[in-house]
Amino acid sequence: MAEEGIAAGGVMDVNTALQEVLKTALIHDGLARGIREAAKALDKRQAHLCVLASNCDEPMYVKLVEALCAEHQINLIKVDDNKKLGEWVGLCKIDREGKPRKVVGCSCVVVKDYGKESQAKDVIEEYFKCKK
């Protein structure tokens, strides 16, 4: 997946890098999915990165996640769709053709463990350095 992004443009974009980081963290059991797990991980300062879906329909949910990230200086990145985020973090079934089915929406994901060093992780870290 990452190779496709690199080959096409020479440099990996943030969305592709985010997908790669989430996939690696999922493999290494380093993800907290959903508000309860995410809030616990953020509060214990175990989080390296937090991903929040912009189309979350619960304003208090968004406020809580943003406040915890701000309080503990944890990087927060927003994606536009919770279904897409759910697919990226493995909350779906994969059919025979390799296409995701029965995707469950996920409004918040916290990366507790990146799993391993990768170019995607470096792209994400560089993105946050530029934002500061």
From Swiss-Prot:
One of its GO terms (cellular component) is Golgi apparatus. It comes from the Eukaryota. The modification N6-succinyllysine is found at K129. Its main location: cytoplasm. GO terms for biological process: cytoplasmic translation; maintenance of translational fidelity; positive regulation of canonical Wnt signaling pathway; ribosomal small subunit biogenesis; translation. PROSITE patterns: RIBOSOMAL_S12E. InterPro entries: Ribosomal_eL30-like_sf (IPR029064), Ribosomal_eL8/eL30/eS12/Gad45 (IPR004038), Ribosomal_eS12 (IPR000530), Ribosomal_eS12_CS (IPR047860). The modification N-acetylalanine is found at A2. SUPFAM superfamilies: L30e-like. It is found in: Cytoplasm; Nucleus, Nucleolus. One of its GO terms (molecular function) is structural constituent of ribosome. Part of the small subunit (SSU) processome, composed of more than 70 proteins and the RNA chaperone small nucleolar RNA (snoRNA) U3. Subunit of the 40S ribosomal complex. Belongs to the eukaryotic ribosomal protein eS12 family. Part of the small subunit (SSU) processome, first precursor of the small eukaryotic ribosomal subunit. During the assembly of the SSU processome in the nucleolus, many ribosome biogenesis factors, an RNA chaperone and ribosomal proteins associate with the nascent pre-rRNA and work in concert to generate RNA folding, modifications, rearrangements and cleavage as well as targeted degradation of pre-ribosomal RNA by the RNA exosome. Subunit of the 40S ribosomal complex. This is Small ribosomal subunit protein eS12. It comes from Homo sapiens. The gene is RPS12.
